[in-house]
Amino acid sequence: MTEEQLFAVYTHVPWTRKVEDTKTTDPEGHPIELLYFIRQNRRDLVMKPNDEYGGKGIFVGWELDDREWDNAIQTALSAHYLVQTRVEVARDSYPSWNSDDEAIQWGEYTVDLDPFVFFGEIEGLLTRLSATALCNVTAGGGGVPAVSAKLARAEAAEAEAAE
């Protein structure tokens, strides 16, 4: 990898290790026993399978109790799993349509806003909302339109000026 690529990885990819009984370093670079670290830091970690998609097999530490987390570690040790530090994501209130009540209801959702960057320029967005920590569609998330309020105001001002 080039220096620029390495910088991008270290800047944007959270601390990641293969789940195994080994010595390594923690996110600050201190030596650790990895399994002990994983057990002690459940609320700040997520474990992900190497060969799955759509949120299948992901263990979100802050959503599990200690017993469930220990079971997750055993599962991770028997397969190919990675452990990563938690990345804080936005949660906010959004309206949704409740077809049972035929009414709009407000709820708190996890926001997943993923820019498509080409040659240093943002060329588009993928935006999803989810009632859970996982935003992918198979885990209950849903794609939603992204609207730039700044751009919308500018276009509205242009339209008003044209009238």
Residues covered by each model-derived region:
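Active-site nucleotide/adenylate-binding loops and adjacent lid/helix of ATP-dependent enzymes
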Residues: 1-91
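ATP-dependent carboxylate/phosphate-activation module, predominantly the ATP-grasp catalytic core
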Residues: 51, 56-163
